[in-house]
UniProtKB/Swiss-Prot annotation:
Keywords, sorted A to Z: Acetylation, Chlorophyll, Chloroplast, Chromophore, Manganese, Membrane, Metal-binding, Phosphoprotein, Photosynthesis, Photosystem II, Plastid, Thylakoid, Transmembrane, Transmembrane helix
Annotated protein name in UniProt: Photosystem II CP43 reaction center protein
InterPro entries, per the entry: PS_antenna-like, PS_II_antenna-like_sf, PSII_PsbC, PSII_PsbC_sf
Modified residues (Phosphothreonine): T15
Subunit structure: PSII is composed of 1 copy each of membrane proteins PsbA, PsbB, PsbC, PsbD, PsbE, PsbF, PsbH, PsbI, PsbJ, PsbK, PsbL, PsbM, PsbT, PsbX, PsbY, PsbZ, Psb30/Ycf12, at least 3 peripheral proteins of the oxygen-evolving complex and a large number of cofactors. It forms dimeric complexes.
Mode of membrane association: Multi-pass membrane protein
Record-annotated membrane-spanning stretches: 69-93, 134-155, 178-200, 255-275, 291-312, 447-471
KW NAD (keyword) present: no
Biological source species: Coffea arabica
Length: 473
């Protein structure tokens, strides 16, 4: 295996373009990749690839810190976060920092601290990235064998996989510790309209936790996205963190079995494709979570979900017309169904009208009015509280339906506010990124499989535009 490092000049993809731009072991002549192929030039230069990855981490953390401080600087405490286009402060608020009852921001200092910590971290990462990209050793195998690797070394690759899994498990436990011991997290279901609380009674029953994975993804089932209490969420992170850490230890201590050695492609590009496939699933899952889930993404910070805004509109007009003397239990709508209330396919009492399609919605402002058979008529007549009316009127006018030119809200709602909800931004961006990463997964998986089969020759470069251009130097 020791001889593999010296094969840096050779790579299994044949690329034919002018190699006039020399970059000391990072040019096309020695790597088979031109300057614009980026990190592909560093496939077999573990030290330089480390620099690229550390610098990339620095850019990511710099964005987090800078954007965090930007949001703090622009934040107006009197307005809800979702009306101000914020996407980072809602995450910090959800973790219980700086907020009090009802999701009201009482202290912005923790947000400032978060921004500064990320900014300082990014400087450290940036320095490390530049050091390893420009000054550090080209390869780590000779001087630092623990950090060195050869892509074909299956045992080393699964050891690296194990280390990554342990780090992910520690990350999951950080949330658990925050919820249990370090001030708790924001619970939108806390009595009286949401509050920060410590999560004490964790759900650790495997039947409940893994039951989510077995649920249908449709309708009122909603797969894991349907989770709606923090005990299950934090308990799920205990399970997830434990599985990741135990799996990490397993992968560090063992070598891949024969079936895995045969079934998988063992090359840098193959690992890239596996990672892109995983990130694609993360993106699609995050998209569904932020669009539908109002427990993990509390509506106090992210605005109502689409179904929530629709049900809020029905509730608001039920309240208004009931005050004006309508009998909401028996009033008939234009289609012959109930105007305010009707029955779902399974017999529960639900809101009538167009919002009937969202009858699965669960929201903290609405659940107190439900009985064993859906909405309770006597509670609707006697028990509606002013905070529920205010909350639903607010959500009705803030549906997450804005377009880029910000013609926002439900088309039928004349009081809708013109804004684009963070739910729209986050769901759309994660769907699009999830899709792109999936395409990248297919692309790199195809190339890696072809290279492993020995017939990858790259693209025909005879008519490459770059060939007719003046060399950069």
């Amino acid at each position: 295996m020791k001889t593999l490092y010296s094969l840096r000049r050779f790579y299994h993809v044949e690329t034919l373009f002018n190699g006039t731009l020399a970059l000391a072991g990072r040019d096309q002549e020695t790597t088979g990749f031109a300057w614009w192929a980026g990190n592909a030039r560093l496939i077999n230069l573990s030290g330089k690839l480390l620099g690229a990855h550390v610098a990339h981490a620095g850019l990511i953390v710099f964005w987090a810190g800078a954007m965090n401080l930007f949001e703090v600087a622009h934040f107006v405490p009197e307005k809800p976060m979702y009306e101000q286009g914020l996407i980072l402060l809602p995450h910090l608020a959800t973790l219980g920092w700086g907020v009090g009852p009802g999701g009201e921001v009482i202290d912005t200092f923790p947000y400032f601290v978060s921004g500064v910590l990320h900014l300082i971290s990014s400087a450290v990462l940036g320095f490390g990235g530049i050091y390893h990209a420009l000054l550090g050793p080209e390869t780590l195998e000779e001087s630092f064998p623990f950090f060195g690797y050869v892509w074909k070394d299956r045992n080393k690759m699964t050891t690296i996989l194990g280390i990554h899994l342990i780090l992910l498990g520690i990350g999951a436990f950080l949330l658990v510790f925050k919820a249990l011991y370090f001030g708790g997290v924001y619970d939108t279901w806390a009595p009286g309209g949401g509050d920060v609380r410590k999560i004490t009674n964790l759900t650790l029953s495997p039947g409940i936790i893994f039951g989510y994975l077995l649920k249908s993804p449709f309708g009122g089932e909603g797969w894991i996205v349907s989770v709606d209490d923090l005990e299950d969420i934090i308990g799920g992170h205990v399970w997830l963190g434990s599985i990741c850490i135990l799996g990490g230890i397993w992968h560090i201590l063992t070598k891949p079995f024969a079936w895995a050695r045969r079934a998988l492609v063992w090359s840098g590009e193959a690992y890239l494709s596996y990672s892109l496939g995983a990130l694609s699933i993360f993106g699609f899952t995050a998209c569904c979570f932020v669009w539908f889930n109002n427990t993990v993404y509390p509506s106090e910070f992210y605005g109502p979900t689409g179904p929530e805004a629709s049900q809020a509109q029905a509730f608001t007009f039920l309240v208004r017309d009931q005050r004006l003397g309508a009998n909401v239990g028996s009033a008939q709508g234009p289609t012959g169904l109930g105007k305010y209330l009707m029955r779902s396919p399974t017999g529960e009492v639900i809101f009538g009208g167009e919002t009937m399609r969202f009858w699965d919605l669960r929201a903290p402002w609405l659940e107190p009015l439900r009985g064993p058979n859906g909405l309770d008529l006597s509670r609707l007549k006697k028990d509606i509280q002013p905070w529920q009316e205010r909350r639903s009127a607010e959500y009705m006018t803030h549906a997450p339906l804005g377009s880029l030119n910000s013609v926002g809200g439900v088309a039928t709602e004349i009081n809708a506010v013109n804004y684009v909800s963070p739910r729209s931004w986050l769901a759309t961006s994660h769907f699009v990124l999830g899709f792109f990463f999936f395409v990248g997964h297919l692309w790199h998986a195809g190339r890696a499989r072809a290279a492993a089969a020995g017939f990858e020759k790259g693209i025909d470069r005879d008519f490459e535009p770059v060939l007719s251009m003046t060399p950069l130097n």
